């Protein structure tokens, strides 16, 4: 599926401001200001300055929470977004109940205790982010994520993403589920991308971020076959 740019000149703007460059700027800025996030049972609230808030928006990390403070901005991050910034980019700090979580193991265990499928979803999220896709929540489409080639203000999302694992949820177990998902994503001009996240059996690492090394990600795009596309031209003899 070709990118569907939202306005004339959007493609040129995207080429002039690649996502990887903006993420690099964000990483540098957050590291210098020692941005601090506060972990709750469902998300992370990150306290930043106006400049960092703008960079986070350009990179599509989190959502702005409206507050009364003029100088401070509060950004609500999902667990996957927060751990990516903490573990992969190493540019923010996070605390829980007033105590700073000094290493990734503490944060990993805390997030895993709050969200049962955190490991699988984070592996899928980081897999896509590492390929410079913009990753957002897919809740409104009944999927885990939606992904964009660039900022959503420039281009429409191309894929609706479902994350599957062995022994995980029961989605896409029967043909009717697959048919419904494909029809739904097709109705909003997206392709259905299924990420199969599987791991080797290694119980010693399950509570550690090191277990991410044992996961593999297989990508599979599912599309609806249209008979009209393969019919012969009726005018031919």
From Swiss-Prot:
Per its record, the protein catalyses: pretRNA = a 3'-half-tRNA molecule with a 5'-OH end + a 5'-half-tRNA molecule with a 2',3'-cyclic phosphate end + an intron with a 2',3'-cyclic phosphate and a 5'-hydroxyl terminus
- Outcome following mutation: residue 191 to T: In strain: cv. Landsberg erecta
| Keyword vocabulary terms for this entry | Lyase, mRNA processing, Nucleus, tRNA processing
Q: What is the effect of changing residue 24 to L?
A: In strain: cv. Landsberg erecta
- Chief localization class? nucleus
Q: Which InterPro entries match?
A: tRNA_endonuc-like_dom_sf, tRNA_intron_Endo_cat-like_sf, tRNA_intron_Endonuc_cat-like, tRNA_intron_Endonuc_N, tRNA_splic
What GO molecular function terms would the record report?
lyase activity; nucleic acid binding; tRNA-intron endonuclease activity
The annotated consequence of residue 27 to Q reads: In strain: cv. Landsberg erecta
Pfam families (UniProt xref): tRNA_int_endo, tRNA_int_endo_N
Q: How does it assemble?
A: tRNA splicing endonuclease is a heterotetramer composed of SEN2, SEN15, SEN34/LENG5 and SEN54.
Name of this protein = tRNA-splicing endonuclease subunit Sen2-1
From the broadest rank down, the organism's phylogenetic lineage runs:
Eukaryota, Viridiplantae, Streptophyta, Embryophyta, Tracheophyta
Q: Which gene encodes it?
A: SEN1
